[in-house]
């Protein structure tokens, strides 16, 4: 026999113990504020605490203290309340911070709840945006239709999103014709358009033909007096006139919207043909939003297109900021800055990273730094169990087993000692230097003697010439 309320009472008792500081053996410090909790509860709720507490399971008698600087105290308060009560206080201001902290603490349940909250808020915003791209308020006021005006107010008001058909809610896209009651109330145009021109614009603007609503389903109280009698006496004439008015009104409404909101119309989202799903209550709101906006991006998952303008221009915009990228993979990586997702865990220490290259650098610099590995078998070796081999200019390390298998007997072993430079003895060096200096002196003396001899010869010749002249 099972008691469904047993786990609820158990959580309540644990929460009361935490608030009264009873049996709390784990202290968490966030921004200088201390939070006390039970290590068993944290171990069962968070993957990060599970890894942290499993490493320090030997010190069971002393309380454990952990310090965090990656999130705020208010964010951790919300997460701690969720751990002990199962209730997560989310709002538009703290959903990103809570999701980032939950990703750091490896709490998948909290991440899933935050994803649903963000998706539902985006659905509401895009639904209001879709209502903005419906028929303008100017056209709705000129038609004078109370039924259409009620539908417009229902779509634009966020508090009455799920009205029933009894109150007359009606949602139409910008390419849908107004109800037939508004067309019958409006007086006929004095200058009707030519059928050829109407068919030409209709073929260009509306690829799919529009069929008027059946007149038999319209109550007589919604019609104006003369038009009701005309419908009863000559139904075929009214139907033909309504078709002509439908073409004219549709063309005018589409042209006016195209002129006024040409830029905004390209951003509109497609309407779902199942409009009656809005009348089924708030329970089907998420299903309806998924049907209307199938192009919505999913958080922490595959990112789909974000609008026709981005698909046409080849750029994708972040839904949280103004950052734009060219590839879906870049947008998915950028979203991790807002969501705090870390999908790449380290198998050695459990630390998680947002990018794969950061994980590789961490593993190489932290876990593989300073390790000597055999080049052949890739096993760790030491200076005792391995040797450094120098093959020409290449140097690598092999273990003794690989050396024996390879039969490397005639290989130069490099023990890490630099060979001394081979220089001649000091006596020989001095002799060479003295020899060079003596050679230079001898050459200089020979040159000096030759110069003196030349000068003496020249002087003697000059003296002989002077004597002959005298």
Swiss-Prot record:
Task: Describe the location of the BTB domain by residue ranges.
Answer: 24-92
Pfam families on file? BTB, zf-C2H2
GO BP annotation list:
regulation of transcription by RNA polymerase II
Any one GO MF annotation of this record: DNA-binding transcription factor activity, RNA polymerase II-specific
User: What PROSITE patterns does the database record attribute to this sequence?
Assistant: BTB, ZINC_FINGER_C2H2_1, ZINC_FINGER_C2H2_2
- Assign the protein's first listed, main location to one coarse class: nucleus
Where are the compositionally biased (Basic and acidic residues) regions?
439-450
Q: Which UniProt keywords apply?
A: DNA-binding, Metal-binding, Nucleus, Phosphoprotein, Repeat, Transcription, Transcription regulation, Zinc, Zinc-finger
Biased composition regions of type Polar residues, renumbered to the chain = 269-278
Zn finger (C2H2-type) location: 316-338, 344-367
Enumerate the subcellular locations listed in this protein's record, separating them with semicolons. Nucleus
GO cellular component terms, semicolon-separated:
nucleus
| Spans annotated as Disordered | 260-280, 439-470
Q: Which domain of life does the protein's organism represent?
A: Eukaryota
User: Which InterPro entries does this entry report, sorted A to Z?
Assistant: BTB/POZ_dom (IPR000210), SKP1/BTB/POZ_sf (IPR011333), Znf_C2H2_sf (IPR036236), Znf_C2H2_type (IPR013087), ZnFinger_BTB_dom_contain (IPR050457)
Task performed by this protein: May be involved in transcriptional regulation.
Protein name, UniProt field: Zinc finger and BTB domain-containing protein 8A.1-A
